[in-house]
């Protein structure tokens, strides 16, 4: 039989998959180290086709069963390639190597699934330069026996206490194997071990002297005897190990200058923590039930790497715009690969949404210090895990969290823990379907405990293992008010689509791209009541009044008051209309637009009065602003933060040069509410725009609109070492006011090309002598812009 085409080429690393999901964890680890790995199932080709393979290295993966009955071609491949290329066996792969060379595989004496053991090793071969006592994650019930091991094989590693074989090596050939899983997130120095294997060359240790396998100066590796059961040390559970490490982390943070407990108290007293919202109220306010708590989660002890390229801020914004009520951020660094920075950036990313989700610090909270950290970095709530705390300590941390205005999420896993949470008076209780001591998942846990909170004023949350709408619907029927979803969301190829499917949300309407919209129009440089009223009757949505003294269209405060009085009087004669549209969670600039382009802009309040200023003292802005103007336009080089000091919305002008400069920070949220693009006159010393009739490059403006206000992640998986822009999409076009060049003759084309939110005109509708507005041109401009 000939090989399939994809196996007929030279192969860097061939991995034989023994039908085990861990194969792909191992595959990912190797790929992240730069390896080119080809994976085939152990029944993909017949034994007779093995000699046709052209490979540089062979790996035999983990797998269930016994090597003699369940390993397919693995043993034959080891026999053929031993002495020709480097070979690595993992878990069942080790058992296959031992079996091939004449050893016996038998019951290990204990089933080790997800258990962690420290190991000693011989510091040679793939263990070269690795520290002693490294932690190893074990998933096996079989192992090699020392007494039956053939002379060709040497023991290279054993567990520290039980002396179970964790590594073997052929004495002549470059054949290494480990019983544990180096690719596991809990296994220490796993990448280094795999990296060493990738550096091996040829089929013998003589060809690899740098690995010191044949070095006579090194001492022999002493296996030792298995100690009596009574002296065997207890192996800590994963939960115990995590909590012990978190205590070390907290102690280190407390001792670091700038982050001492006193420092955090001072910062909190200075009100430097972001404003908070009520966690329970946010869950209750969810429009779609159950409320979704969407989690940012890069890795876990049970699953290893999940989405190592995930960007916490972008993921949080994607969740929020898709309908999440809570953003849960893992901040544990060692096993979950999270950080406080992740949480702070996630909070910043959603800070300017009109209905921002609550931020949950998901961590192993064991100290009040961590609660201070959480509040300072923007959390609205923290997780308290009953399984990690004594009842007294739980009460203390719960009360302390409440003292900072944060109602905690209290996590339970069984009836006893639920009783403790209810006694505590917790308002939000989460049931973790995953037992944190062994990380096994039982989806029935929430269902069994739901009855205990029925008829109580408690929001019950399901916290783990949720993968589809069926799981969600089952919990809703049992009274669950919120679901936390992490891994499934992080692995989803389309995050927003998965959330819609999970919560049975219909597809929302387009946010702007490809959607027909009519732009607003503004007539700038109004100088008289007559011009203002004529522009208003023509359908202008905004009128610009120039307060820049050097402008030829400058109006005094007295004249501005007269114009404002005329417009305000006109407004009062119009009926008050409401839009009736439910406000959605939308990005900052999109949310500033009138709902359905109606209400204020199209009806009773139209047109709005805009005061235009340029590099003038704040006192000048504020004098006319409060009683007269609806908006302020900053047309100079004013600091962006100045927008926070005005009592009315602010339009910030971006001065665009012919080469595209001037667009930096166009989409920065939270300061000005609207952005206007105007063209800089070529050769201008001030680099400021306005009043010259210079046309903005419409292609540049179009690209700015299409680039979008925000980019939401399609998937947390990304496509490289970081989540690239190609892995995200702009669902919300950037709303801009297009100035600089539009006039009655070209505004329709400008609208078609750029798709602006509004168009602005000044000199393009003036009389020939520039003394005022040509009212016919004003009417023609509005008509052409709105395609009336």
UniProtKB/Swiss-Prot annotation:
Stretches the record annotates as Indole-3-glycerol phosphate synthase: 238-503
Active site: 91, 181, 183
Region (N-(5'-phosphoribosyl)anthranilate isomerase): 520-788
Catalytic activity: N-(5-phospho-beta-D-ribosyl)anthranilate = 1-(2-carboxyphenylamino)-1-deoxy-D-ribulose 5-phosphate; 1-(2-carboxyphenylamino)-1-deoxy-D-ribulose 5-phosphate + H(+) = (1S,2R)-1-C-(indol-3-yl)glycerol 3-phosphate + CO2 + H2O; chorismate + L-glutamine = anthranilate + pyruvate + L-glutamate + H(+)
Sites where the protein binds L-glutamine: 63-65, 141-142
Database matches in Pfam families: GATase (PF00117), IGPS (PF00218), PRAI (PF00697)
MF-aspect GO terms: anthranilate synthase activity; indole-3-glycerol-phosphate synthase activity; phosphoribosylanthranilate isomerase activity
Keywords of this entry: Amino-acid biosynthesis, Aromatic amino acid biosynthesis, Decarboxylase, Glutamine amidotransferase, Isomerase, Lyase, Multifunctional enzyme, Tryptophan biosynthesis
SUPFAM superfamilies: Class I glutamine amidotransferase-like (SSF52317), Ribulose-phoshate binding barrel (SSF51366)
Pathway recorded for this protein: Amino-acid biosynthesis; L-tryptophan biosynthesis; L-tryptophan from chorismate: step 1/5; Amino-acid biosynthesis; L-tryptophan biosynthesis; L-tryptophan from chorismate: step 3/5; Amino-acid biosynthesis; L-tryptophan biosynthesis; L-tryptophan from chorismate: step 4/5
Ranges where the Glutamine amidotransferase type-1 domain occurs: 12-207
Any single GO BP term: L-tryptophan biosynthetic process
EC code: 4.1.3.27, 4.1.1.48, 5.3.1.24
Family matches, as NCBIfam families: PRK00278.2-4, trpG_papA
UniProt cross-references to PANTHER family, sorted A to Z: INDOLE-3-GLYCEROL-PHOSPHATE SYNTHASE, TRYPTOPHAN BIOSYNTHESIS PROTEIN
Primary role: Trifunctional enzyme bearing the Gln amidotransferase (GATase) domain of anthranilate synthase, indole-glycerolphosphate synthase, and phosphoribosylanthranilate isomerase activities.
Protein name from the UniProt record: Multifunctional tryptophan biosynthesis protein
Organism: Phanerodontia chrysosporium
């Amino acid at each position: 039989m000939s090989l399939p085409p994809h196996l007929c080429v030279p192969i860097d690393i061939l991995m034989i998959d023994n039908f085990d999901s861990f194969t792909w964890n191992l595959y990912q680890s190797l790929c992240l180290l730069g390896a080119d790995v080809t994976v085939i199932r152990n029944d993909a080709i017949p034994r007779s086709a093995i000699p046709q393979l052209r490979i540089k290295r062979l790996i035999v993966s983990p797998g269930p069963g016994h090597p003699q009955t369940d390993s397919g071609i693995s043993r034959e491949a080891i026999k053929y390639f031993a002495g020709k290329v480097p070979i690595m066996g993992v878990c069942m792969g080790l058992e296959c190597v031992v079996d091939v060379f004449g050893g016996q595989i038998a019951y290990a004496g204990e089933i080790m699934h997800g258990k962690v053991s420290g190991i000693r090793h011989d510091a040679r071969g793939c263990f070269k330069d690795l520290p002693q006592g490294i932690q190893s994650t074990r998933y096996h019930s079989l192992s090699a026996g020392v007494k039956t091991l053939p002379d060709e094989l040497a023991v290279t590693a054993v567990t520290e206490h039980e002396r179970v074989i964790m590594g073997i090596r052929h004495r002549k050939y470059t054949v290494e194997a480990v019983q544990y899983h180096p690719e596991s997130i809990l296994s220490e120095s796993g990448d280094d071990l795999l990296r060493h294997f990738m550096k091996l060359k040829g089929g013998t240790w003589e060809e690899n002297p740098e690995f010191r396998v044949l070095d006579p100066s090194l001492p022999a590796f002493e296996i030792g005897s298995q100690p009596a059961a009574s002296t065997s040390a207890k192996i800590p559970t994963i939960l115990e190990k995590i909590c012990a490490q978190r205590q070390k982390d907290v102690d280190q943070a407390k001792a670091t200058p700038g982050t001492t407990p006193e420092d955090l108290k001072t910062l909190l007293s200075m009100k430097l923590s972001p404003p908070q919202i009520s966690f329970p109220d946010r869950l209750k306010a969810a429009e779609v039930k159950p409320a979704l708590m969407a989690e940012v989660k890069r890795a876990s002890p049970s699953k290893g790497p999940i989405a190592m390229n995930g960007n916490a801020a972008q993921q949080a914004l994607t969740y929020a715009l898709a309908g999440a009520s809570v953003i849960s951020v893992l901040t544990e660094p060692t096993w979950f690969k999270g950080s406080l920075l992740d949480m702070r950036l996630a909070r910043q990313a959603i800070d300017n949404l009109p209905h921002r989700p609550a931020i949950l610090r998901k961590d192993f909270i064991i100290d009040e210090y961590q609660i201070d950290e959480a509040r300072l970095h923007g959390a609205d709530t923290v997780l308290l895990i009953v399984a990690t705390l004594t009842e007294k300590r739980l009460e203390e941390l719960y009360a302390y969290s409440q003292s900072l205005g944060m109602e905690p999420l209290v996590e339970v896993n069984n009836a006893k823990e639920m009783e403790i949470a209810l006694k505590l008076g917790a308002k939000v209780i989460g049931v973790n379907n995953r037992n944190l001591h062994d990380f096994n998942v039982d989806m029935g846990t929430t269902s069994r405990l739901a009855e205990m909170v029925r008829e109580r004023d408690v929001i019950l949350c399901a916290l783990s293992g949720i993968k589809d709408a069926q799981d969600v619907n089952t919990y809703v029927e049992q009274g669950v008010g919120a679901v936390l979803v992490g891994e499934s969301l992080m692995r989803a190829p389309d995050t927003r689509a998965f959330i819609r499917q999970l919560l049975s949300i219909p597809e929302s309407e387009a946010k702007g791209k490809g959607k027909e919209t009519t732009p607003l129009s503004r007539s700038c440089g109004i100088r008289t009541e007559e011009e203002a009223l004529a522009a208003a009757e023509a359908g202008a949505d905004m009128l610009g009044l120039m307060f820049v003294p050097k402008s030829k269209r400058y109006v005094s405060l007295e004249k501005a008051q007269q114009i404002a009085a005329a417009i305000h009087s006109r407004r009062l004669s119009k009926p008050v209309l409401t839009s009736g549209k439910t406000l959605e969670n939308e990005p900052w600039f999109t949310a500033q637009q009138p709902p359905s382009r109606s209400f204020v802009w199209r009806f009773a309040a139209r047109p709005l009065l805009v005061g235009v200023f340029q590099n003038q003292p704040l006192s000048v802005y504020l004098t006319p602003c409060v009683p007269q103007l609806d908006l302020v336009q900053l047309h100079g080089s004013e600091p962006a933060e100045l927008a926070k000091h005005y009592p009315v919305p602010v339009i910030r002008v971006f001065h665009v040069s012919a080469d595209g400069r001037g667009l930096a920070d166009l989409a920065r949220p939270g300061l000005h509410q609207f952005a206007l693009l105007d063209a800089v006159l070529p050769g201008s010393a001030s680099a400021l725009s306005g009043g010259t009739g210079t046309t903005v490059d419409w292609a540049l403006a179009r690209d700015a609109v299409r680039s979008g206000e925000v980019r939401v992640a399609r998937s947390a998986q990304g496509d490289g070492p970081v989540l690239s822009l190609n892995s995200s999409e702009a669902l919300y076009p950037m709303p801009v006011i297009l100035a600089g060049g539009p006039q009655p003759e070209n505004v329709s084309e400008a609208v078609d090309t750029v798709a602006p939110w509004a168009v602005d005109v000044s000199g393009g509708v003036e009389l020939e002598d520039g003394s005022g507005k040509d009212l016919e041109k004003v009417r023609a401009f509005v008509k052409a812009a709105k395609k009336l």
